[in-house]
């Protein structure tokens, strides 16, 4: 029988909507399990974006190491692929120290990318993107409906960024 003291739990995942207490639970778990927290929040990655992002306090960050907070400038792009890349590095470093990675946040896309991987999508094309951004949303939605009805039915049609990217992927 394995010695329970030698068992090392795998990563812990805490996901949910804003203001349900995820961060508090993550802090308690980190203290109990000897863990470190990996932020799964699309806004906490940005330096200087402190209002409205519920970043952990300096005291909380001193008590328990946090990762993927304040890692890029607000002017730099950051996406799910970059999150996965940085989260892999953070997780490997945490595990190498014999500690437990605790993924905590509310950005569902980042959790999905981490757990399910990212689909094979073409890289963005600046020229095409500019043309699509200039087009009326209704025109893009019509093209999406005709060329990819499945995506049309599932996409947030009120979100121009998602519609533009969907049409961009179709055209590339």
Region annotations inferred by a language model:
Residues 1-172:
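Phosphate/pyrophosphate-binding catalytic cores of soluble transferases and nucleic-acid-acting enzymes
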